[in-house]
Amino acid sequence: MFQDNPLLAQLKQQLHSQTPRAEGVVKATEKGFGFLEVDAQKSYFIPPPQMKKVMHGDRIVAVIHTEKERESAEPEELIEPFLTRFVGKIQGKNDRLSIVPDHPLLKDAIPCRAARGVEHEFKEGDWAVAEMRRHPLKGDRSFYAELTQFITFADDHFVPWWVTLARHNLEKEAPNGAATEMLDEGLVRQDLTELDFVTIDSASTEDMDDALYAQELGEGKLQLTVAIADPTAWIAEGSKLDNIAKIRAFTNYLPGFNIPMLPRELSDDLCSLRAQEVRPALACRMTIAADGTIEDDITFFAATIKSKAKLAYDNVSDWLENTGSWQPESDAIAQQIRLLQRICLSRGEWRHNHALVFKDRPDYRFILGEKGEVLDIVAEPRRIANRIVEESMIAANICAARVLRDKLGFGIYNVHMGFDPANADALAALLKTHGLHVDTGDVLTLEGFCKLRRELDAQPSGFLDSRIRRFQSFAEISTEPGPHFGLGLEAYATWTSPIRKYGDMINHRLLKAVIKGETIARPQEETTQQMAERRRLNRMAERDVGDWLYARFLNDKAGTETRFAAEIVDISRGGMRVRLVDNGAMAFIPAPFLHAVRDELVCSQESGTVQIKGETVYKVTNVIDVTIAEVRMETRSIIARPVA
C-alpha cells in the first residue's frame, strides 16, 4: 500500500533536503578514525566504522549527525576518488591477492587481481601498477582494484627508480629510432671548424649541448660565439622522433642515470659536440661591451664547428684558482679559458647591477654502487667554471628572446611575473613590519621587483626573503614574449639545450626561419602545456627517487649521536622541516621534539617562527644541529631531533 505513495516520497524528499550535509576531503589518521575537512577552519569527525567506506583523500558529500552536541560525518556520496591509478606492493599469493598502495596515509590492503592480458604471475612483495574498479560509495560492497602492469620484484635493487617512473607514468628507457642522414634545410652553414671552440661540462657528461669561443675586439669589447648542438638538422618536424621528443618534452635526470628525450645515438653522439669531431651547430655571435652590455649587433647563423677540447668544470676552476695539477692542453685553449672568464665576470657584474643574480646553492650528487646502493652524497658548489657556462648561456638566451620577439613576435619563452597582484597588499604589510616600505604598484613592475630583491639580498639573513616567497607567482612557459622577474630580464627564451628540452628544439626551428627570412607558424598552446606538465612530473620523480635514496643513506644513522647541520626551511603547526646542509636531505622535526609542554609552544607558519614561553627560539633559515631520530623506510621519511 506504501509503494509509489506520492506523500511518502514527498516526506522522504523533505527529510533528505532538511538533513545537513557537507562536502569535503577525507583525512585519515593512524588510529582508524578520520576527519572530513570542509575548509581550513571546519572539519567533522568520521568514526572508524564509517571510515571503512572511504579512503584518505576522497572528496565526498557526507550527512552530518549531531548527538549530545557532538557532530560526526556519515559518508554518502563520492565526488572524486583519491585513488584511480596507483602503484603498490602485492600481499598474498595464488587467487587471494591484495595490494597496499605506496602512500604514507594508505595502510589498508585492497583486494585485487590481474587485468586481462597481464601475463605476470603476481607474488608477495611484487611491485605493480593498479587501477581502482570498485568503491563502497558507488554501491559496491568493498574496495577492489585491477593490476594493470608488473613493475618489478621485491628484491630488485633499482626499485626506487622503476616504482617512481611507473607512479608518474614516465618512460624508463631511451627512445628507439635512428636518424640516418641530415635533412636538407636550405641553410648555408659557415665553416668555423678552425676556431678554438671548447665545451665545459661535468667530467661524465656525454650529451654536450654547447661550445664556446671568445675573442678580443679592442676598446675593452669581447666577442662571444655560442655554438649549440643541432638536433633539428636530423629530426624533421612531425616525424616519429619529433613526436616522441614532443611527448617526453625533457631529458629526465634522476639520481644515478638519465632517460633521454632523444635516442642516445643522437643525444650522446651525432648531435653531441664531441672534441675533435665535426658537427653541425646553430650559432649566435654577440658583442659584449666593456661594462658587460650585450650590443645590438646580435647574429644567428647555421655553422659547422669542431670542438677543440672537452673540459671539465673542476679542472677549469682549479686552474683558474691556481690549484690542482691540471693544465690546458695548449696555449690556445688557455687563452680561451681566460677570455671566457673575463666575459663571465663582466656579464655577472652587468646582471648584478641591471638584472638579478641567483644566490649560489650547491648541487648534490648521489654516488651509487653497482646495485644502486648510495656510497656517498657530495655537495658540489657552483664554481667559476660553472658560472662561465651559466653566464654564456644566459647571454645567448637573452639574444634569442630579443631576436624572436623583434622578428617573429613569438617563441617559447620562460615567463615569470614576480608577485601575484592579489598578494601585493599582504606583501607590503609584511615588509612594513620589518622596516621595508614598498609601493604596491611599484613592486609589481620589473624595476620595482628588482629593487626589492636587491634590498632583500642586502639583509643580514635570508629570513625575510623566505617569508615573501609564498607571495610569488610561478614561472610559466609561454609562446608570448614576457618578462622574467626572477632573472630580472625583459624577456628570456632558451635555445641552448635542444638535446634535452623540446622547447629549445622549437626555438631552433623558429630561429632557422628567421635566418632564412621565412614565415613560420606560432607554436601551439598544447605543446607548452605538455612541457609544463612534464617538467612538473620529472621534478616529482627526481624528488621521489631522492627521498628513497636519502632514506637508504641515512638509515644507519637513526638513533645514533651523529650530528648534522640543518637549515630550517619551513615551520608548520606540527613541527619544522629542515634541509641537511652537507647532503641536501629533507627531514622533519615533530613539535614534541622542540618542547615537551605543548601549551608553551607556538609553531607559526605565518611568522616562520617557533616560540617557547613567548620567546622566539627558532626561525626559518636558522641553521641548527640535529641528530637522526628515525628513518621510516616504508614512507621514505626522515625524522630528526634538535641537539639540546
Swiss-Prot record:
The GO annotation for biological process reads: mRNA catabolic process
EC class name: hydrolase
Name the catalysed reactions.
Answer: Exonucleolytic cleavage in the 3'- to 5'-direction to yield nucleoside 5'-phosphates
SUPFAM superfamilies noted in UniProt: Nucleic acid-binding proteins
According to the UniProt entry, where is the signal peptide? none
Gene Ontology CC: cytosol
Name the InterPro entries for this protein. CSD, NA-bd_OB-fold, RNase_B_OB_dom, RNase_II, RNase_II/R, RNase_II/R_CS, RNase_II/RNase_R, RNR_Ribonuclease
Q: What is its EC number?
A: 3.1.13.1
Report domain S1 motif positions: 561-643
Q: Which PROSITE patterns match?
A: RIBONUCLEASE_II (PS01175)
Segments forming a coiled coil: none
Q: Which UniProt keywords apply?
A: Cytoplasm, Exonuclease, Hydrolase, Nuclease, RNA-binding
Chief place of localization: cytoplasm
Cell membrane as UniProt keyword: no
Report the subcellular localization.
Answer: Cytoplasm
Q: Where is the RNB domain?
A: 189-516
Family, according to the entry, reads as follows: Belongs to the RNR ribonuclease family. RNase II subfamily.
Put simply, this protein is called: Exoribonuclease 2
